[in-house]
Curated annotation (Swiss-Prot):
One of its GO terms (biological process) is proteolysis. Residues 17-691 are extracellular. The lineage of its organism: Eukaryota, Metazoa, Chordata, Craniata, Vertebrata. GO terms for cellular component: cell surface; membrane. SUPFAM superfamilies: Blood coagulation inhibitor (disintegrin), Metalloproteases ('zincins'), catalytic domain. Residues 17-142 form a propeptide. This is Disintegrin and metalloproteinase domain-containing protein 5. Its main location: membrane.
């Protein structure tokens, strides 16, 4: 009975999500099994035994990599302050594959927090997800349907006015000769979730993030036949409020989003996922313009009651039309009953595939310049490897409740089992800088990471998490050393400090003449990586120090060259080793530099610092649109590495408004003052309005009194004048009456 109750509650939770029309509810406990692929390559393959409708099915999976190593998710807190978090933890969670014994089947799953995704057979799709209220890896499976969802077509007969077949090359005019074999290509994408969709999906950032990644996973599974993969560059969730004005007209919404996109996400394709209960169309974009920066934006509308599977088809169709593809005609055929580029694909369950028409069109389009933005290789992509859980390494990893270190060196013996990395008894936490020896999370404002430099900030326990908050430090390019140097990656970078670190406390950075002497040589003792340093980059190549001693430099594995420049004995260094054949300057890549090169961030001119052996202006590396110390920090703080204000003592974050005893930032973990749910910025705005009203009252009240006095005075004068005028008129009338009587008498007399 208790199990049934939990399942009922879970079903109600599902109904609050993306698709209330779920049928054939059943439970299963997926069993992880071995297979030849798993035995050969366990890093990239998985296999599960999953029971559906009382029939066991063998599921074979292969890793699906589409989250870039640098991908981030942006969210907003209750003060509307933006926070960013890397998506690297989810990079190796996505898989796709097939059901053994069913040639026309497709499986798309995420596996890091239970199995979530779609199992597609020929005519039916099943969704699977864990029952979080039950232990034992219990999952629920249900058939995906859209019986009551109102799904409009994405076509020219809808309100979607951007779609016009005249904008396209018709298939009949396409040259379909000389096609080459398709090669793997990639599309970099930024994804934005609007506030209404965030609320519709549950108002939980983690849940919404999971669903967005599932959607892109489904899209990539369908795109595999085109050898195309969408890479997630960023996901932004408008959890507080929408950043643009939303319009009922999807065309207007696209224009508004395009303007926002070009200001904040200008480098890649951007999609806005928005909720509309009963939309007139499924989205809008600029057809055939995927690779044009001014037009590579799209809006996908999520109708009420739609499944994630169906919405992924909408996104896929929009993406296809953006590439220049069109809807299938009755002459187009595919391996399954439903082709992807048809309206029917949105509300149909089961496997869907591209038609031969679409494949031919894509092969043709991929040879043209219109799709030049499709990359042959993902930029700076590292080999994706599934993280191995190592209990006892002191790092909290997937499926671990705690990790206090080895059995010998466990930091929280009373709280965490070092063999299983599970919490003991009733422990709240079992490892981390903010976990006490009593197995509870430490209070707010306890220091968990000290500052190591004037550019580095102190971090505090936030009272919620057992681990210290991420490191915060001054933004790159912030002044330090009384304005004589710059902060870079949390350190005040100076040549003096670097020379002392290399050769001892009495050694200092050399003069410009010494740098120019050595770094113009273009050899192993003086260079800017590839060759000699250009004049403007002289201070950014090899580190040159002044040597104050008469004896030679004696340091293991270090070769030194000397030069007497005026009054200074200058030294340049080279770490021993074989010089590569490809270069005479020891290195061919700035990323490979050693400590004998000038550190990035070292000053090289007015408002300029060294970066990758070049002297560059700091303003190019400080995004003032996101954070400006004058505009955003009230001139009582500096911008940190997360683009938020770190306030001086006596000023309250996030906007550095004056408040006794306050300091720091919203990122350093300490408890800053918030009043009535409003930040001090909001409070100051309300105070400003109040002061403005008081000022208006103070000015207008005397003015009203003066005006009233004048009006009263004028009224009195008017009454006096009227009385005098009345008396004058009365006197005149009496005189006229006397004159009349005399005349009449006279008249009588004359008769």
């Amino acid at each position: 009975m208790f199990l049934l109750l939990l399942l009922f509650l879970h079903l109600k939770g599902l109904q609050a999500g993306q698709n209330p029309q779920k049928t054939t509810l059943q439970t299963t406990v997926p069993e992880k099994i071995s297979s030849p692929d798993v035995e050969t390559d366990a890093e990239d393959h998985m296999a599960y035994l999953i029971t559906i409708n009382e029939t066991p099915h063998f599921i074979h999976l292969k890793k699906q990599s589409f989250i870039t190593p640098t991908a981030v998710v942006y969210t907003y807190d209750r003060n509307d302050v933006q926070h960013s978090q890397p998506l690297s933890a989810l990079e190796n969670c996505n898989y796709n594959g097939y059901v053994a014994g069913f040639p026309n089947s497709i499986v798309t799953l995420t596996v890091c927090t239970g199995l979530r995704g779609i199992i597609q057979f020929e005519n039916v799709s099943y969704a699977i997800e864990p029952v979080e209220t039950l232990s034992g890896f219990v999952h629920v499976i249900y058939e995906n349907t859209n019986k009551h969802a109102v799904i409009p077509d994405l076509g020219k007969n809808q309100s979607y006015s951007w779609f016009d077949e005249s904008d396209y090359q018709f298939r009949s005019n396409m040259k379909k000769s000389g096609f080459t074999v398709l090669r793997q290509r990639f599309i970099m994408m930024d994804i934005i979730v609007d506030k209404k969709l965030f609320d519709y999906m549950g108002s939980d950032t983690e849940v919404v993030l999971q669903k967005v990644i599932q959607i892109i996973g489904f899209v990539n599974t369908m795109l595999s036949k085109l050898k195309l993969t969408v890479l997630i560059n960023s996901i932004e969730i408008w959890s507080k409020e929408n950043r643009i004005r939303l319009s009922k007209a999807v065309d207007d919404l696209l224009v508004q989003f395009s303007i926002w996109k070009h200001e904040y996400r200008s480098q890649h394709v951007a999609y806005l996922l928005a909720f509309e209960e009963h939309p007139a169309s499924t989205g809008a974009l600029y057809p055939g313009n995927l690779c044009k920066l001014e037009y590579n934006a799209a809006v996908a509308l999520y109708p009420k009651g739609l499944s994630l599977e169906s919405f992924s088809v909408i996104v896929l169709q929009l993406l296809s039309i953006g590439m220049g593809l069109t809807y299938d005609t009755e002459n187009c055929h595919c391996t399954g009953e439903v082709c992807l580029m048809t309206p029917k694909a949105i509300y149909s369950g089961g496997v869907k595939d591209f038609s031969t028409c679409t494949l031919d069109d894509f092969k043709y389009l991929s040879t043209r310049q219109d799709l030049r933005c499709l990359q042959d290789l993902p930029l700076e992509r590292k080999p994706a490897r599934r993280p191995r859980r190592i209990c006892g390494n002191g790092i909290l990893e997937m499926n671990e409740q705690c990790d206090c270190g080895t059995l010998k060196n466990c930091t929280h013996r009373k709280c965490c089992d070092p063999m299983s990395c599970r919490l003991k008894n009733k422990a709240t936490c079992g490892s981390g800088e903010c976990c006490s020896q009593d197995c509870t999370v430490k209070m707010n404002d306890v220091v968990c990471r000290k500052s190591v430099d004037e550019c580095d900030f102190v971090e505090y326990c936030n009272g919620k998490d057992p681990y210290c908050v991420p490191n915060t430090y001054a933004r790159n390019g912030q002044y330090c050393e009384s304005g004589e140097a710059f902060c870079f990656e949390g350190r005040c970078q100076t040549a003096d400090k670097q020379c002392m670190s290399m050769l001892g406390k009495y050694v200092r950075g050399a003069s410009f003449a010494c740098y120019e002497e050595f770094n113009s040589r273009g050899d192993r003792f003086g260079n800017c990586i590839h060759n000699f340093c250009a004049f403007r980059n002289s201070l950014c190549g090899k580190l040159i120090c002044t040597w104050p001693f008469k004896k030679l430099v004696l340091k293991a594995n270090l070769s030194v060259a000397y030069a007497q420049i005026r009054d200074d004995l200058c030294v340049a260094m080279y770490k021993g080793g074989r010089i590569p054949k490809t270069t005479k300057t020891t290195y061919s890549n700035p990323a490979d530099r050693d400590e004998t090169f000038v550190n990035d961030g070292t000053i090289c001119g007015p408002d300029m610092f060294c970066l990758r052996a070049s002297c560059t202006e700091t303003r190019f590396h400080m995004d003032s649109s996101k954070c400006d110390s004058t505009r955003d920090c009230n001139d009582h703080g500096v911008c940190n590495n997360l683009q938020h204000c770190h306030c001086d003592i006596g000023y309250n974050p996030p906007f550095c408004e004056e408040h006794k005893g306050q300091f720091g930032s919203v990122d350093d973990g300490h408890k800053y003052h918030v009043e009535d749910g409003k930040s001090y910025k909001q409070q100051s705005h309300s105070n400003l309005k109040k002061n403005q009203l008081q000022l208006i009252l103070y000015i207008s009240l005397p003015l009203l009194v003066m005006i009233s006095a004048v009006v009263i005075k004028q009224s009195k004068l008017s009454r006096v004048c009227d009385r005098e005028r009345s008396e004058s008129d009365s006197s005149t009338t009496e005189d006229s009456g006397s004159n009349t009587n005399v005349t009449s008498s006279g008249g009588s007399t004359s008769h």
